Amino acid sequence: MWKITWIQLMNRWRSNVWVCVELLLAFCLAWYMVDYFFVEIYNRSLPSGRGYANVWQVEMGLLPETSPDYRAAESDSIAMLGNYERIKDRLRDYPGVQAMGAASGCYSTPYTGCYYGIGLANAADTSKREAVMRYEIDPTTDFLSVFNHSYAKDGRPVSTSDFDWGDPRAIVTTRMVERKVFGEASAVGREVKDPFDEEGPTYIVKGVLEDIKRFDNSLPQGAAFLAIRPSAEEIPEMNYFIRIDPAVAGPRFADTFREKMSRELRVGNFYLKRLTSYERIKADTDYSFGITYDYRVRMALMAFLGLNI
């Protein structure tokens, strides 16, 4: 009898242990997913430091030498520089364009996932440093206004023309750089340099902006904006951005722009390659970097857990 009683107790104990293990696993899984979504919601609630509403990217292509429309005379340095200025002017003058910006390369294109970092340190004390995102922008355009950047001090909207880009050592940074490198002191007018490049230049901070997010679900980061005056060889790598008046930002905008500007932007050997809204760019980046996929996986796990509990 004692043996039978003992066996029954052990069987019940094993059954209870398995129930406890299952509940513990379910709790851990639920906690993991709830924590993930809590962090996502928190990160997305933070200011992004810039905006993408009504912003479009204009990509220009360059005819190959094998094209029947290619003109060799348009590829020399003087012609390239002149054509670059004409492209910018025609984008600025398009009806409904409120601001136009140009920046160099993929890494200077917001929300594409491309990344190019730079270290910044107090030139007088390089132990105080911060690694930040690097953007190279054409100061004759209004890149900062296109993406609605704002001052760290009072939140006012920023224009690229607010700063003295005539100084070849000019740099504009963000609040995180100021705080990490200079503490409570203002960074404006102070010298910074890349601590990892001993032979590199020393920059002078011309302004401090709000920190920006690389992605919507990431924390705000520091950034540095430097001027680029592209050479003829660098011009084909430039990207162009326009922010349009909400009044013309209807579904017909893209079709109308392509129809008219395909002719207007046929400058030298350049042609209009692609016009993409930032809504589309952000959606594509979220998908390609797994953000959309992560959501789907965790939502599926949540549904599976809910059905089985």
Spell out what each predicted region is.
Residues 258-296:
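A cross-kingdom feature of multi-pass membrane systems that activates on extracytoplasmic/periplasmic
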Residues 12-42, 50:
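Short, strongly hydrophobic transmembrane alpha-helices
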Residues 1-12, 87:
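A short amphipathic helical element positioned immediately N-terminal to and/or at the very start
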Residues 34-126, 130:
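Membrane-proximal extracellular/periplasmic loop immediately following the first transmembrane helix
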Residues 129-223:
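Hydrophobic secondary-structure segments that place a key small or acidic residue at a functional site
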Residues 302-309:
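A hydrophobic alpha-helix feature that marks transmembrane segments and, especially
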Residues 80, 196-270:
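Small-residue transmembrane helix packing/gating motifs
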